[in-house]
């Protein structure tokens, strides 16, 4: 008996295909896809990064806690109505284990205002879990912006978990 390999893509729905394209083999690849989708204003690609779970959550700077993919999608759809979000990861600190990863990200955000382009810095925490579908984002929490990047004086100090 001959064993034939049939590509999984042949059996996938459009939504699953989008997830497969957006989500790679590592949490880093999911994060890269997330920020690329923000910069393109691509809602489907952005949502493909999220886990298909009821309790995923997102907190935008100064905003409420959004729970569930539907609430998260609606918030990003509203944000994308004003154009893509020019958020670039400047620095990422990672804590990873077998099935979860936490990325603390310093984001540089560029926005156009009536006075011209402005830059702000946001601290975000992105949490990823390894699911049956691969690595997926389960939480995104972003701080209010600041015109100054936080200094890195504490980088050399030992970190204590509590």
Task: Annotate the PLM regions.
Residues 2-48, 56-162:
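A beta-strand edge to alpha-helix "cap/lid" segment located at domain peripheries
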Residues 51:
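Helix-to-beta-strand junctions that scaffold the AdoMet/dcAdoMet cofactor pocket
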């Amino acid at each position: 008996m001959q064993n034939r390999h049939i590509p999984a893509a042949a059996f996938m729905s459009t939504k699953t295909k989008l997830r497969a394209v957006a989500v790679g083999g590592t949490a880093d690849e999911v994060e890269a896809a997330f920020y690329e989708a923000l910069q393109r204003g691509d809602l489907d690609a952005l949502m493909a990064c999220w886990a298909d779970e009821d309790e995923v959550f997102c907190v935008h700077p100064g905003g409420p806690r959004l729970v569930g993919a539907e609430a998260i999608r609606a918030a990003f759809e509203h944000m994308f109505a004003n154009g893509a979000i020019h958020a670039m990861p400047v620095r990422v600190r990672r804590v990873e284990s077998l099935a979860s990863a936490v990325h603390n990200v310093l984001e540089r955000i560029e926005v156009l205002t009536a006075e011209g382009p402005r830059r702000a810095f946001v601290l975000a925490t992105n949490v990823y879990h390894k699911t049956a579908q691969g690595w997926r984002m389960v939480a995104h929490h972003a701080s209010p912006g600041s015109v100054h990047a936080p200094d890195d004086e504490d980088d050399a100090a030992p970190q204590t978990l509590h």
